[in-house]
Amino acid sequence: MGLPANDFRYTLASGRTGTLYGIRANYTLVFFNNPDCGMCERIRAEIVASPLLSEMIRAGRLEVLALYPDEDLTAWRAHAPQVPSSWINAYDAGARISKEELYDLKAIPSMYLLDRDKRVLAKDAFEVGYIEWLLDRQPQ
């Protein structure tokens, strides 16, 4: 905790790419998820239903990067409409995050909360309530 997160490149459905460090927001929530994961769907719904997270997203203080770390893009594309349009919905081309061990994804889903400078505030989180609790205690 408190250490800089590893940067990585992500790819959007359009083919455009971006980097984690290119995301400009006070906080970034990296949500590692899979299309056919029931727990991932539950967490996505909890993020959407959270008044705190929704307000922070609306105000531009929180950016959610929903990242698919695997290689079956057919499943990812079919699932894309379920991800809120206010989020960055992306995949890891070539599964570099796993192959290069940039993040130790013990389980999916997993959330990493990062501050403006991409320092890790929470890692391997799977409870939205914990993310809310942390954000509620951070300087705005």
Feature-to-residue mapping (PLM):
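N-terminal "domain-start" segment that seeds a small globular fold
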Residues: 1-21, 133-135
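Short loop/turn microsegments at loop-to-beta-strand junctions
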Residues: 5-6, 27-28, 108-109
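Hydrophobic beta-strand positions
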Residues: 9-10, 32, 113
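Short acidic-hydrophobic, aromatic-tinged amphipathic segments that line or gate anion-handling sites
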Residues: 10-11, 88-93, 124-125
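Short active-site neighborhood of thiol/selenol oxidoreductases, capturing the structured segment around
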Residues: 18-47, 63-65
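Structural microenvironment flanking redox-active thiols in thiol-disulfide oxidoreductases
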Residues: 41-81, 95-101
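Short, internal strand/loop/helix patches
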Residues: 77-112, 116-117
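Thiol-/selenol-based redox modules, centered on thioredoxin-like
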Residues: 113-140
